[in-house]
Amino acid sequence: MKKEFAVIGLGRFGGSICKALSEEGVEVMAMDIDEDKVNEYAKIASHAVIGDSTDESVLKNLGLRNFDHVIVAIGENIQASILTTLILKELGVHTITVKAQNDYHEKVLSKIGADHIVHPERDMAKRIAHNIVSNNVLDYLELSEEHSLVEIVANSRLAGNTLLDLDIRAKYGINIVAIKRGKEVIVSPLATEVIHQEDILIVIGSVTDISRFEKRVLHTK
């Protein structure tokens, strides 16, 4: 049985989520108070409905409690976002992801029980900034305030060495959890694995330790 998702708020972020989920082949219900936006996504989502998500009866009648995951992507109206999240929690929705506008909004969402809170603009800005500064870093994902996961292209200083030779965990406190080599992905590589030039290393660790590794081994400023 396919998982069912609902996206409430069809602005730039919510619309992108709706499209991405639809492309994955899952059932998606798209909802917005703006009729034009709903019409725009009528052919993309499995169902598209006009409705006020701050009205508990509307969410009940739509059967939101039966959905596996609801994404609250309401734009500028923080009050509507908070109230919608509260109603969804009271309805017993299994998983709720909410777009936060600022740190205050995030704190409130956390207190009322949102399962996942995202800051799309802030998070994307951090990824772009990190990628600009670090030429060897292909991608950057913030896991928490202190830890990140990055994709690093192996340079000549790393190539030809085994993971044991480099001893990255002991020296820098970070872990190489996978290696992408062409179309091959080596998950949990052995200590005897030799790194090739242009391998993509999937590294996880604290932001401070990853930065230290980049500066000393990858020669980033």
Swiss-Prot record:
Boundaries of every RCK C-terminal domain copy: 135-219
Q: Which family does it belong to?
A: Belongs to the KtrA potassium transport family.
Q: What role does it play?
A: Catalytic subunit of the KtrCD potassium uptake transporter. The 2 major potassium transporter complexes KtrAB and KtrCD confer resistance to both suddenly imposed and prolonged osmotic stress.
Q: Where are the transmembrane segments?
A: none
One protein family per Pfam: TrkA_N
Matching entries from PROSITE patterns are given as:
RCK_C, RCK_N
Task: Give one GO molecular function term.
Answer: monoatomic cation transmembrane transporter activity
Domain named RCK N-terminal: residues: 2-118
**Which SUPFAM superfamilies does this UniProt record tie to the protein?**
NAD(P)-binding Rossmann-fold domains, TrkA C-terminal domain-like
Report the locations given in the UniProt record.
Cell membrane
Gene Ontology cellular-component annotations: plasma membrane
PANTHER family in the record, alphabetically?
KTR SYSTEM POTASSIUM UPTAKE PROTEIN C (PTHR43833:SF7), POTASSIUM CHANNEL PROTEIN 2-RELATED-RELATED (PTHR43833)
List positions binding NAD(+).
R12, D32, I33, D34, D52, S53, I74, G75, E76, K99, A100, Q101, H105, E121
Q: Can you name this protein?
A: Ktr system potassium uptake protein C
Q: What is the deletion mutant like?
A: Impaired potassium uptake.
The membrane topology of this protein is: Peripheral membrane protein
Q: Name one GO biological process term.
A: potassium ion transport
Keywords noted in UniProt: Cell membrane, Ion transport, Membrane, NAD, Potassium, Potassium transport, Transport
Q: How does it assemble?
A: Homodimer, tetramer (dimer of homodimer) and octamer (tetramer of homodimer). Part of the KtrCD complex formed by an octameric catalytic ring of KtrC and a membrane associated dimer of KtrD forming a potassium channel.
Q: Which organism is it from?
A: Bacillus subtilis (strain 168)
